[in-house]
């Protein structure tokens, strides 16, 4: 159990029921009792926690500015950064196929795991505890975030960049949908006519998958 003791120190929370943490770390490819329900719960808690923090931190910002900052803080790449800080990839339980394809490094899987841990903390202790721990994780990010252009989501930023350069807009096509209706994984293929490449995004919703693909294109174009 030493490895989970180490993880609990990294996330600044000690579980009373360690099975909740184990479930939060279990991808659906590894077991029938996986982390997707916990992820659903954690996603809602995370969005509320960050929205509440931003509301009080920026009393003069309008709804649009607050929404963009929240989107930046709860999006997949940001959650994946937290996951890497906790080294979650070393603790996750993945099926053979996901392990072989490097699932422990995939941003979508890492981000989902962070949300699942938030959900697990709320069940193990309370909603208040989950909120407090989440705010602790986000302390530096909340301190550094500012209203501004870079808070727009990846799809919006990509569209504005292409329009500004009079380039054709991207197309997003669903290439694959896996899982039951309540816990699906979407694979989106994004093509920009002026780029000789196709980009793939994966997410727990079509929107998340499209945003992930757009983020890859922005990175390839070196657009911050």
Curated annotation (Swiss-Prot):
Keywords: Cytoplasm, Endonuclease, Hydrolase, Magnesium, Metal-binding, mRNA processing, Nuclease, RNA-binding, rRNA processing, rRNA-binding, tRNA processing. One of its GO terms (molecular function) is metal ion binding. One of its GO terms (cellular component) is cytoplasm. One of its GO terms (biological process) is mRNA processing. The keyword Cytoplasm applies. Residues 4-126 form the RNase III domain. It catalyses: Endonucleolytic cleavage to 5'-phosphomonoester. Belongs to the ribonuclease III family. This is Ribonuclease 3.
